[in-house]
UniProtKB/Swiss-Prot annotation:
GO molecular function: tryptophan synthase activity
Keyword Lyase: yes
The UniProt record lists the keyword Cell inner membrane: no
Reaction it catalyzes: (1S,2R)-1-C-(indol-3-yl)glycerol 3-phosphate + L-serine = D-glyceraldehyde 3-phosphate + L-tryptophan + H2O
Record family assignment: Belongs to the TrpB family.
Coiled-coil boundaries: none
Pfam families to which the protein is assigned, alphabetical: PALP
Cofactors demanded by this protein: pyridoxal 5'-phosphate
A single GO cellular-component term on record: cytoplasm
Pathway recorded for this protein: Amino-acid biosynthesis; L-tryptophan biosynthesis; L-tryptophan from chorismate: step 5/5
Oligomeric form and interacting partners: Tetramer of two alpha and two beta chains.
Source organism of the structure: Beijerinckia indica subsp. indica (strain ATCC 9039 / DSM 1715 / NCIMB 8712)
Gene that this sequence comes from: trpB
Record's protein name: Tryptophan synthase beta chain
Keywords attached to this entry: Amino-acid biosynthesis, Aromatic amino acid biosynthesis, Lyase, Pyridoxal phosphate, Tryptophan biosynthesis
């Protein structure tokens, strides 16, 4: 990575893993040697041309990168019709960054391949991971199958039930899926179990975290592996339009797809950046919008915004999307909110469902429920932008995994 200026938004974290007051590494004493060893190996790998060449080769020939930057013509017509109905003449030109076309159907594989190559360098033979929607679990199981590594996936029992297609895929790929019965039996609880496993099996096990959270160096490492999204978008938009986009949109659970798109543009002051959290039933009801409805605290090894009750106990997040119900957020997003560089919005379940159907009917693309949250805000914001405004939304995953969930929600009651 080129040297960043001191006033850069891209220079974090510091040597202790902090983005301002966020981040860090709050871990058990038994884990600290593993964390420091991981940090050392990652620092060496990221400047090793052989590591980059191997990862780039896999991204090209195994994942199918670069993913297309697609002009969503009919969605653009739709937002311009909304603008015209309101008496305006605007409506942004909407592009999709099509991460759903990657092998395994989401952005998760970008990060997993980087971490698995690192695990092999470290001599680890057993890989563990947590998963919510199942996309990170599938990506991890896929990479482990590719390299002949033992794979154990921790998944909340509720998510096992609502993401059956992905559970079958993981089993088919040779992974052992462990349903987690503690707590709310969702992603937070799966992450707790994975951390317990890691402490118990320190010698042969590598923990492949799926989002830009956790103890340092994970937030920075996951971000770096996902930055291929934003770097490609930058190149592709310059080729298509001769200039950078005017705005970026991405959904946020832990926030890896978003930071991967955003990071290469953070020092471009004319590029507006929007992250979209899950507002669930509404911000005054059950939701998973940590930035909108949470406050700073420590969870899973880092300080960030968390959903907490008055006593500081972690509350359970709710979203129709299994990939967005984490009750925290990556620490770099917490810092970007504090600095004001990124604007964080939220979309309710019903808004995401509407956008899910709209995208399918207008573009012939069935998005995952996660990026449907971002699409909901695109439909809201884009009509107010001028016609020459170039907007990119990250379609971070495909919707195959969600069709049964959506069918249940849309089924007439009684």
């Amino acid at each position: 990575m080129p040297h960043e200026p001191l006033n850069s938004y891209r220079s974090g974290p510091d040597e202790r893993g902090h983005f301002g007051i966020f981040g860090g590494r709050f871990v058990a004493e038994t884990l600290m040697p593993l964390i420091l060893d991981l940090e050392k190996h990652y620092a060496l790998a990221r400047v090793d041309p052989a590591f980059k060449a191997e990862l780039d080769g896999l991204l090209t020939h195994y994942v199918g990168r670069p993913s297309p930057l697609y002009y969503a013509e009919r969605l653009t017509e739709h937002v311009r019709a909304i603008a015209a109905h309101a008496g305006g003449r605007g409506g942004a030109k909407v592009y999709f960054k099509r991460e759903e076309l990657n092998h395994t159907g989401a952005h998760k594989i970008n990060n997993v391949l980087g971490q698995i190559l690192l695990a092999r360098r470290m001599g680890k033979t057993r890989i563990i991971a947590e998963t919510g929607a199942g996309q990170h679990g599938v990506a991890t199981a896929t990479a482990c199958a590719r390299f002949g590594l033992e794979c154990v996936i921790y998944m909340g029992a509720v998510d096992v039930e609502r993401q059956k297609p992905n559970v079958f895929r993981m089993n088919l790929l040779g992974a052992k899926v462990v349903p987690v019965q503690s707590g709310a039996r969702t992603l937070k609880d799966a992450m707790n179990e994975a951390l317990r496993d890691w402490v118990t099996n320190v010698t042969d096990t590598f923990y492949c975290i799926g989002t830009a959270a956790g103890p340092h160096p994970y937030p920075a490492m996951v971000r770096d592996f996902q930055c291929v999204i934003g770097e490609e978008t930058r190149t592709q938009m310059l080729e298509r339009e001769g200039r950078l986009p005017d705005s970026l949109f991405a959904c946020i659970g832990g926030g890896s797809n978003a930071i991967g798109l955003f990071h290469p543009f953070l020092d471009e002051p004319n590029v507006e950046i929007y992250g979209v959290e899950a507002a669930g039933f509404g911000l005054d009801k059950q939701h998973a919008a940590s930035l909108a409805g949470g406050r700073p605290g420590v969870l899973h090894g880092n300080r960030t915004y968390l959903l907490m009750d008055a006593d500081g106990q972690i509350e359970e997040g709710h979203s129709i999307s299994a990939g967005l119900d984490y009750p925290g957020i990556g620490p770099e997003h917490a810092w970007l909110k504090e600095t004001g560089r990124v604007t964080y919005l939220s979309a309710r379940d019903d808004e995401a469902l509407d956008a899910f159907q709209l995208c399918a009917k207008l573009e012939g693309i069935i998005p995952a429920l996660e990026p449907a949250h971002a699409l909901a805000k695109v439909v809201e914001v884009a009509p107010s932008k001028p016609r020459d405004h170039l907007l990119v939304v990250n379609i971070s995953g495909r919707g195959d995994k969600d069709i049964f969930t959506v069918a249940d929600y849309l089924a007439p009651v009684g």
